[in-house]
């Protein structure tokens, strides 16, 4: 019997099958061969001509998976996800540069550097699951609308609809009578039988947390009605990703012995993507420790449909402000809502790092020199793990506060508190 490539095995009837133990849990090996052992330095410095071939830094260490082969799975026609890891001890970059200066009195140079290798810290420890979870929660939710929250906020919604109708009526009357001053009531609030003048802050907060949520609720209910008879395909793929920049600094690079030094920053993008292949089943499901399981009885179905913990949180005053910094709402939504019932056939969790941009400077004896350079990556981090679970949200503090809308919200909320 012939020997099969790594990743395959013979079945009971000598058919060729995937060896999932080898594909999903492979043994890693260490790759230590230096890919760029030399760099060249050519040009003129201090009236001396250089044409040197110099050794690059050694000691390369990369933990990686071996190459394996797969065949399509008979039941689905898809090739299985394989675990792939390329885990360098340090990130490696290749620099090509031209450096020149002229400080007078013979202190000048014009040098060309090719294939100069240097290494930096590898920021491999990252997990952006909290950014992926809301999109999974929304994609596999049994309903677009949050009916529990809509029921909990029903009284406030009715009051707000009454205010909108009152405004429309007053606007119609003002136009009919030709009383343009009375048109101001279209944007004013009404309390205890009196109209109160509007402020920019009140209008903004009403738009953000009154009018827009109302429109979204109406849209979601209409989508649920339109999709009530949809037939979902037998097998689907779904994936979401998130990336964030990370800056690594480097200093004290001396490609030309002690003539000058280089320093700068490298902007890396750390990316996290999670994906699944899944089959749809009849009925509904709930979240259970990273996976979805069918509901067990009508009580569990009703509880997940309402999601009382999320409703209680949504009805808590200023809970939306807390959600700017702590992902409480995302956690309650993921763990308590009602889902479509699916079977996860295959899946992956991938993290990698890619080179995005760089800046570089040179100096000689504290004085800047001219540097034009290009940079390419040699060893970057890559990890793709097989998984059959969904990403899991954990409590996380976010202090970036990068949303301009949240900045405006904060200003107007503080203004309201000060006025009180």
Swiss-Prot record:
Q: Quick one: effect of changing residue 198 to T?
A: In strain: TW18
Compartments (UniProt record): Virion
**Biological process according to GO:** adhesion receptor-mediated virion attachment to host cell; symbiont-mediated suppression of host cell wall biogenesis; symbiont-mediated suppression of host peptidoglycan biosynthetic process; viral release from host cell by cytolysis; viral release via suppression of host peptidoglycan biosynthetic process; virion attachment to host cell pilus
Q: Mutating residue 219 to K has which effect? A: In strain: TW18
Top-level taxon of the source organism: Viruses
Is the keyword Transferase in the record?
A: no
In UniProt terms, what is the effect of altering residue 389 to S?
A: In strain: TW18
Outcome of substituting residue 412 to S: In strain: Qbeta_2_FR and Qbeta_3FR
Q: Kindly state which keywords UniProt assigns to this record, in alphabetical order.
A: Cytolysis, Host cell lysis by virus, Host-virus interaction, Viral attachment to host adhesion receptor, Viral attachment to host cell, Viral attachment to host cell pilus, Viral release from host cell, Virion, Virus entry into host cell
Tell me the segments the record calls region RNA-binding. 158-176, 226-236, 294-298
Looking up InterPro entries in the UniProt record yields:
A_protein
Q: Which GO terms describe its cellular component?
A: virion component
| Keyword Endoplasmic reticulum recorded | no
Q: Which family does it belong to?
A: Belongs to the Leviviricetes maturation protein family.
The protein's assembly and partners: Interacts with host MurA; this interaction inhibits the first step in host cell wall synthesis. Interacts with the capsid protein.
Give a short account of what the protein does: Induces host cell lysis. Inhibits host MurA activity thereby blocking the synthesis of murein precursors necessary for the host cell wall biosynthesis. May be responsible for the attachment to the host pilus. Makes extensive contacts with the viral genome.
The protein, known as:
Maturation protein A2
Its source organism is: Escherichia virus Qbeta (Bacteriophage Q-beta)
């Amino acid at each position: 019997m012939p020997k099969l490539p790594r990743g395959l095995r013979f079945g009971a009837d000598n058919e060729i099958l995937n060896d999932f133990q080898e594909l999903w849990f492979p043994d890693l090996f260490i790759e230590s061969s230096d890919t760029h052992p030399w760099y060249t330095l050519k040009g003129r410095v201090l009236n001396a001509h250089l044409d040197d071939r110099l050794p690059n830094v050694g000691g390369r260490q990369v933990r990686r998976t071996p190459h394996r082969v797969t065949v399509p799975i008979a039941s689905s026609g898809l090739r299985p996800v394989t675990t792939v890891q390329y885990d360098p001890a340090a990130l490696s970059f290749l620099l090509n540069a031209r450096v020149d200066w002229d400080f007078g009195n013979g202190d000048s140079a014009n040098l060309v550097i090719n294939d100069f290798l240097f290494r930096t810290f590898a920021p491999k420890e990252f997990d952006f699951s909290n950014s992926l979870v809301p999109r999974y929660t929304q994609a596999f939710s049994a309903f677009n609308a949050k009916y529990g929250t809509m029921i909990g906020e029903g009284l406030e919604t009715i009051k707000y609809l009454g205010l909108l109708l009152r405004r429309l009526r007053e606007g119609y009357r003002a136009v009919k009578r030709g009383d343009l001053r009375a048109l101001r009531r279209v944007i004013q609030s009404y309390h205890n039988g009196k109209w109160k003048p509007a402020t920019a802050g009140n209008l903004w907060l009403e738009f953000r947390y009154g009018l827009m949520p109302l429109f979204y609720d109406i849209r979601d209910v209409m989508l649920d009605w339109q999709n009530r008879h949809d037939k979902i395909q037998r097998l689907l793929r779904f994936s979401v990703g998130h990336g964030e920049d990370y800056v690594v600094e480097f200093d004290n690079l001396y490609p030309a012995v002690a003539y000058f030094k280089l320093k700068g920053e490298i902007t890396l993008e750390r990316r996290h993507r999670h994906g699944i292949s899944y089959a749809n089943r009849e009925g509904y499901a709930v979240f259970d420790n990273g996976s979805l399981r069918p509901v067990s009885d009508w009580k569990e179905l009703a509880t997940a449909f309402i999601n009382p913990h999320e409703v209680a949180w949504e009805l808590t005053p200023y809970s939306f402000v807390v959600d700017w910094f702590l992902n409480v709402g995302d956690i309650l939504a993921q763990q308590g809502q009602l889902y479509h019932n699916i079977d996860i056939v295959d899946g992956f969790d991938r993290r990698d790092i890619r080179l995005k941009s760089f800046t570089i400077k040179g100096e000689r004896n504290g004085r800047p020199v001219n540097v034009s350079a290009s940079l390419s990556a040699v060893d970057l981090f890559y990890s793709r793990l097989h998984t059959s679970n969904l990403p899991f949200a954990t409590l996380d503090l976010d202090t970036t506060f990068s949303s301009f809308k949240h900045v405006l919200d904060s200003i107007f909320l503080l203004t309201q508190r000060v006025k009180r």
